[in-house]
């Protein structure tokens, strides 16, 4: 039989199983994070944990956290700080370059149930050492200083649905862009502080799941992708969104969900 680990055989009615993958790799990676100055990579995999690959070339990786592997991050200014998650808001952290890992947060809703998505979107703001993750339709989970064990808190914002995509501005300190499962887009300034402010910059005609956000040559150039069928799946604004408008730029892509979109850093006219 087959599952998310590959192909297996039982000849005794399920008492024992034999791995029949024959070195075939079937693992699905939800995410990867790349070290800023080496060949080191970590990645979260579907039901197969978070794995570390330390050098280039063909090799066997090392599992660093078990269970499901979710979104992974490496601080690009201090690679000692690395993060992964299993499910929901169960976040693991390494403070020594990935040599050891421990549970950093396991944050649940007030009624004790899991909050966020099963594979939960998150993002790092390395400049301000802040960590953000989806939580519920009215709040975003926030860790203001992930270099310490300070208590987490939340950004209060009426999202209308769960946050499904994040992007920290590469241009303006403390600016966080947020997309939602209901097709809305928000810009949060000073997101790492207690005096943050929120503005909605959503397109007027979208209600599908926003799967990614990217920022172009400045904070006014924003790209979003949507994940559904029968819709325009790629939108761009060059005026900051909201009343300044968004343009569908899907072109002749087939009618299928778009999972991620990125600008060409050498030519912001290309996606």
Feature-to-residue mapping (PLM):
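Beta-propeller blade termini and top-face loops
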Residues: 1-271
């Amino acid at each position: 039989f087959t599952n998310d680990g590959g192909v297996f055989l039982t000849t005794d009615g399920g008492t024992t199983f034999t791995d029949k993958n024959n070195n075939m790799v079937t693992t699905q990676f939800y995410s990867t994070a790349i070290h800023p100055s080496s060949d080191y990579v970590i990645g979260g995999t579907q039901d197969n944990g978070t794995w570390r690959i330390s050098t280039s070339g063909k090799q066997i990786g090392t599992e660093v956290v078990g269970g499901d592997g979710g979104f992974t991050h490496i601080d690009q200014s201090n690679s000692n700080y690395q993060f992964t998650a299993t499910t929901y808001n169960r976040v693991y952290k390494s403070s020594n370059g990935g040599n050891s890992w421990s549970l950093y947060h396991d944050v649940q809703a007030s009624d004790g149930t899991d909050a966020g998505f099963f594979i939960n979107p998150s993002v790092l703001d390395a400049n301000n050492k802040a960590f953000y993750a989806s939580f519920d339709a009215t709040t975003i989970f926030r860790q203001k200083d992930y270099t310490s064990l300070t208590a987490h808190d939340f950004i209060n914002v009426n999202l209308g649905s769960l946050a499904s995509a994040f992007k920290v501005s590469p241009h303006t300190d403390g600016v966080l862009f947020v997309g939602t499962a209901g097709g809305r887009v928000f810009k949060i300034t000073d997101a790492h502080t207690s005096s943050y402010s929120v503005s909605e910059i959503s397109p007027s005609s979208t209600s599908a799941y926003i799967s990614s956000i990217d920022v172009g040559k400045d904070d006014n150039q924003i790209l979003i992708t949507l994940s559904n069928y029968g819709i325009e799946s790629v939108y761009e604004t060059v005026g900051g969104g909201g009343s300044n408008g968004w343009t569908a730029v899907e072109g002749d892509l087939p009618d299928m969900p778009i999972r991620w979109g990125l600008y060409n850093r050498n030519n912001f006219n290309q996606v």
